[in-house]
């Protein structure tokens, strides 16, 4: 997640939490449908701690939709705000899509960040209707498929619950973007985290997997646990071996994207065609770059 950013040109729209987006959504228009995070309990997250969760009223959403052409021109995609925009109820999301079609006809698709539990109350039929209305590739912050890790960082759901929701999206024909949070389990948890997360995604319609690497943010509970000696970070080489194992185990036809500053290399690759090339490239990093140099890269980019 990048942000919060709050460009001056967007000041006439409602962005209570600023604008938060993945790097690849830089060319999208932005529209707030929620503020803050509906969960706000993940131990590693430093975002939205000062923003109470709120669902935007439809009249506010409509006013902002009408501003999109003036501020963003003729965008082809809208990326909904904020931390988990799909926490908005089905009716609100469908009405939002209708408003976008009416006032911003250039838009071809609608995305946004989502949590697994945002889909608990939405049926496969509703998700299929959302896809037909223009929703495509929501970015789901799954983080891990390892129950021990999910529980330790208080994600708020189990791997089985995550799989059930991803299966629902797949059944509904809704492709999605998911992530792999490298190092989230801390020292010693990497290989289990890698294997179980790759297994979670098997058979799912995941169109892209974006990788980022855990960076402890001052003020977060996980940062304080490290300061007290109750959490031990994975080393840089351990993280690379973890990512290597994730790639080896991943069976999906998908795009693997590393574009986050927390990761020491940038790549966009098609899997499985370029899998071995990635695995070999990571091995060259392991063989050629000392732990200390990789750590300096992390310390120079202190964001999650």
What is the predicted role of each segment?
Residues 2-25, 104, 202-304:
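Auxiliary Fe-S-binding modules of radical SAM enzymes
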Residues 16-60:
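Canonical Radical SAM [4Fe-4S] cluster-binding loop centered on the CxxxCxxC motif
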Residues 29-31, 76-78, 108-114, 138-140, ...:
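Hydrophobic faces of well-ordered beta-strands that scaffold small-molecule active sites
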Residues 37, 45, 61, 80, ...:
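Conserved, mostly hydrophobic/aromatic
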Residues 61, 93, 123, 162, ...:
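Aromatic/hydrophobic pocket-lining residues that form the small-molecule binding cavity
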Residues 69-172, 251:
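Conserved SAM/AdoMet-binding glycine-rich loop
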Residues 117, 141, 145-149, 169-193, ...:
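Conserved strand-turn element in the central/C-terminal portion of the radical SAM core barrel
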Residues 125-127, 186-203:
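Catalytic cores of alpha/beta
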């Amino acid at each position: 997640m990048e942000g919060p950013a709050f460009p001056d040109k967007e000041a006439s729209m409602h962005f209570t939490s600023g604008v938060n987006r993945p790097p690849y959504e830089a060319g999208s228009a932005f529209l707030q449908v929620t503020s803050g995070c509906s969960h706000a309990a993940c131990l590693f997250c430093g975002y939205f701690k000062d923003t109470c969760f709120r669902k935007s009223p439809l009249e506010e959403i409509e006013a902002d939709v009408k501003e999109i052409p003036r501020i963003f021109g003729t965008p082809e995609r809208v990326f909904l705000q904020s931390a988990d925009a799909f926490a908005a109820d089905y009716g609100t999301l469908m009405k939002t899509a209708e408003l976008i079609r009416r006032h911003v006809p250039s838009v071809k698709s609608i995305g946004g960040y989502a949590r697994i539990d945002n889909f608990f109350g939405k049926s496969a039929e509703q998700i299929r209707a959302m896809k037909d209305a223009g929703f495509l590739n929501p970015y789901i912050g799954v983080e891990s498929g390892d129950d021990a890790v999910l529980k330790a960082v208080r994600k708020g759901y189990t791997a089985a619950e995550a799989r059930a929701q991803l299966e629902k999206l797949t059944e509904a024909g809704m492709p999605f973007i998911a992530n792999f949070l490298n190092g989230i389990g801390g020292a010693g948890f990497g290989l289990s985290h890698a294997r179980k997360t790759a297994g979670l995604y098997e058979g799912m319609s995941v169109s892209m997997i974006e990788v980022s690497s855990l960076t402890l943010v001052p003020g977060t509970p996980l940062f304080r646990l490290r300061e007290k000696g109750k959490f031990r970070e994975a080393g840089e080489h351990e993280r690379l071996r973890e990512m290597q194992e994730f790639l080896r185990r991943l069976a999906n036809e998908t795009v693997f994207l590393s574009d986050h500053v927390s990761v020491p290399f940038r790549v966009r690759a098609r899997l499985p065609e370029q899998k071995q090339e990635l695995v070999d490239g990571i091995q060259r990093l392991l063989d050629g770059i000392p732990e200390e140099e990789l750590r300096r890269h992390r310390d120079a980019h202190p964001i999650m």
